[in-house]
Amino acid sequence: MSKLRVMSLFSGIGAFEAALRNIGVEYELVGFSEIDKYAIKSYCAIHNADEQLNFGDVSKIDKKKLPEFDLLVGGSPCQSFSVAGYRKGFEDTRGTLFFQYIDTLKEKQPRYFVFENVKGLINHDKGNTLNIMAESFSEVGYRIDLELLNSKFFNVPQNRERIYIIGVREDLIENDEWVVEKGRNDVLSKGKKRLKELNIKSFNFKWSAQDIVGRRLREILEEYVDEKYYLSEEKTSKLIEQIEKPKEKDVVFVGGINVGKRWLNNGKTYSRNFKQGNRVYDSNGIATTLTSQSVGGLGGQTSLYKVEDPIMIGHIDLKGHDAIKRVYSPDGVSPTLTTMGEGHREPKIAVEYVGNINPSGKGMNDQVYNSNGLSPTLTTNKGEGVKISVPNPEIRPVLTPEREEKRQNGRRFKEDDEPAFTVNTIDRHGVAIGEYPKYRIRKLTPLECWRLQAFDEEDFEKALSVGISNSQLYKQAGNSITVTVLESIFKELIHTYVNEESE
């Protein structure tokens, strides 16, 4: 086989095509089908496609007149099966569009197909929807495998679970009963077990492992964002009220000492092995209960805390005792403070200087310091205060920040660096940036939403260049499929099936 001939249905902005391009597959686009005028503009710009290749409304296509092709890609509109779209299924016209996909397979009999849809269809109508779909693929001559894949495992910080169905024409491979991983009991494996009873034509596709969450949300955020994306202080305050306050750390036991021998037990041990006065606790935990009596032969000490030693990182050139020349790291604890605090006798701490907000680079008042270090000495001769850089603020995904009441069940705020909420066409999610409770909350930008679907910056710029508005850019991202997930599927499909057939 020379070039892989591809037909695309329900094309959107062409995630399947972007994935094939990204992994270097030489393919010929024989046609696509899309009815949204803005998506068509973006699609043609991104893929350098002639609009004459658009067959338009899939329900009006004469399938017999379609050109020949090897691979059919697409996912029929998912709103009718999704939780966000209220799950009307085949009762919704959009749900019945699935059968246009089946009719295309039946008439043209391409070698392969890749189909995508929402997780909700697996159990929709008590499993009958998936049963009908799987039986339909079998009836038109395809062996299938299916899997539930989450975008967060494909180098995209978005929690997006979708079902992917791969089909290979039955004359090209032998039937192979599905192997369901032992001990697996999720919704997809249950669905597969149910389908096996229907004698679905099947094979075992090698799916990518889902065990490593790659990129963090902070890695796809734009550095400079227009103020229009930020919520007002009033809205921000109301949202922050919905955050559960961080819990204090528990009392953490780390070891014990023998009062007579003064040794620290570094082995695995338990607090019950030591008397109360001999127990050592982590200083990062909360304090133990204070009592009014002496315990453990240690006078009035009720508990002991393990602390890190001062960390000396250098010397400065001063006259006098060695102790006053030492410079300490802010990562350790302070050395013992003495009453002789003048004449350079105070402890010196290294604080990272990261820049100056004065264009000339001069002036102490304009200096900016890293928040991971300690504050420089505060003085009273300037009223503008010290500028602190926050290099690693919390980045917390926020569900529909512009809505006072959230429309979906579940959390309003995720924890720092968790994957973003699922991008869709209805909800616009956001991020809280800062440290509790001093967050600034904003919406994700259109570019960030495209990045969450793993589209290249160049793809986004091409859509912008043909005049696509922000509202349409959001919609197009929400309607699309995560490109990196499709890349992983195509790599296996091409390597194991397409290339082997060509040899």
UniProtKB/Swiss-Prot annotation:
It is an enzyme of class 2 (transferase). The keyword DNA-binding applies. It holds the Pfam family DNA_methylase. Its EC number is 2.1.1.37. Keywords: DNA-binding, Host-virus interaction, Inhibition of host innate immune response by virus, Methyltransferase, Restriction-modification system evasion by virus, S-adenosyl-L-methionine, Transferase, Viral immunoevasion. It catalyses: a 2'-deoxycytidine in DNA + S-adenosyl-L-methionine = a 5-methyl-2'-deoxycytidine in DNA + S-adenosyl-L-homocysteine + H(+). It comes from the Viruses. The active site is at C78. GO terms for molecular function: DNA (cytosine-5-)-methyltransferase activity; DNA binding. InterPro entries: C5-MTase, C5_DNA_meth_AS, C5_MeTfrase, C5_meth_CS, SAM-dependent_MTases_sf. NCBIfam families: dcm. A methyltransferase that methylates C-? within the sequences 5'-GGCC-3' and 5'-GAGCTC-3'. Modification confers resistance against restriction enzymes that recognize these sequences. Belongs to the class I-like SAM-binding methyltransferase superfamily. C5-methyltransferase family. This is Orphan methyltransferase M.Rho11sI. The lineage of its organism: Viruses, Duplodnaviria, Heunggongvirae, Uroviricota, Caudoviricetes.
